[in-house]
Amino acid sequence: MKVKELVNKIADFGTSPHVYIQKEGIIGGGKPDDVVNTFGEMTVNSFIAAGRGQIKIFVK
């Protein structure tokens, strides 16, 4: 599954989802569109394998 697919699935659950992706000390977060534009084409497995990546998703 690609990161964008995961984000889109989670985004369906909330009216204002907020997604944070943390990777190797670099934190990118914000609206799902921002995250998808940056990391969306990576698969979740490759994202995590490339470094200690974490995907934190908060749904309001």
Where are these regions (language model features)?
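N-terminal acidic leader/helix
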Residues: 1-20
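Detector for the mature cores of small, proteolytically processed
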Residues: 15-60
